[in-house]
Amino acid sequence: MQNINRTIGQASSFGNKKLRAYTNFVMIYLKSFHIPSESEENGFFIDYSGNNKLTCYNSFYPFQVFPAKGLSDMTFSEITIFAGGNGSGKSTLLNIITERLGISRTSLYNKTDFHSMYMPLCSGEFGIYDRTQMRELMSVSKFITSDDVLSHLLDVREKNDNLDFKRKIWLENRREYIINPGQGPREIDMDDPESIRKYREFNEQINTSRSFSQTLRRNIGTNERTFSNGETAIKYFSDKIEPGGLYILDEPENSLSSEYQIDLAKFIESMARFYDCQFIISSHSPFFLSMKGAKIYDLDAQPASVKKWTEIPNMKLLKDFFVEHNDEF
């Protein structure tokens, strides 16, 4: 716990980035978002089917997902959470908001032929109108998915594995050069960069005046510092989340133990309160749903509605489970 708290603390200092003066009140950049209602979707299909045959499609996604939930207009707080079970539309809603607002993202997602027709029917209302402020906001805002975190974990592991392999080969070559010096380059062509590189590498490999560690760092590089998967995941979030941004997080609890979920939830609360960040999150974790100031949409409800975190069915299920096993604690 101590190590990861220190990691978050270091990350939240934002290195050498210059911080502007932050406000003492929460920032709500995205005030509301509209997705097409049932009547709007019906109007689209009437107009579209007039000139097109729809019998070749068995899905009109993302159409026909949210009208049954009675969800059309949403308003946001500094932290807004979409809660619901698998297939409730949490990730779909985040993808729609991200694409319509043009927020930066790394991971791709599957689109159907109807995405380009659905997006013009969606709209968002921002609380800032100055173009410079809007550019600043969009320059730091991000959509972060659980796939992004997993990809980062794998990238770090692959990078370190590659460096370890190169280091092993380099040391084997050095050992061979020392045992059999004649295997090194016999001459150097000063007009050939590759010849110069090979001669310099050979010279460094047999030169004992330079320490092994210095030579290896110069020629191979250094491994990225490794943490546990949970520590690496939470550090990824703290590195990506900067002051003054709108951040959309898709199930950030993935890859995190309960302990690290609590740490990340506290970090998000702090960024919203003190560093002018706004968050829109999909989650079914009690540690995120219980964050202070969070506005929660229950997408499993009919119609979808705002609820207290203790009213979410999954939270009631967890409570009943622990009450049932209370004597075992």
Residue ranges and their predicted role:
Residues L101-L137:
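Flexible phosphate/Mg2+-sensing switch loops adjacent to catalytic phosphate-binding sites
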Residues F143, N162, I169-R174, M190-P243, ...:
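Conserved ABC ATPase signature
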Residues E259-Q278, S285-F329:
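C-terminal lobe/lid and adjacent interdomain/linker elements of RecA-like ASCE P-loop ATPase modules
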Residues A68-S77, K240-E242:
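Phosphate-binding P-loop
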Residues F25-G70:
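N-terminal pre-Walker A segment at the start of P-loop NTPase domains
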Residues L154-P185:
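Internal, charge-rich low-complexity segments
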Residues S77-K111:
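Phosphate-binding glycine-rich loops of NTP-binding sites
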Residues G244-L246, Y275-I280:
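Loop/turn-to-beta-strand initiation segments
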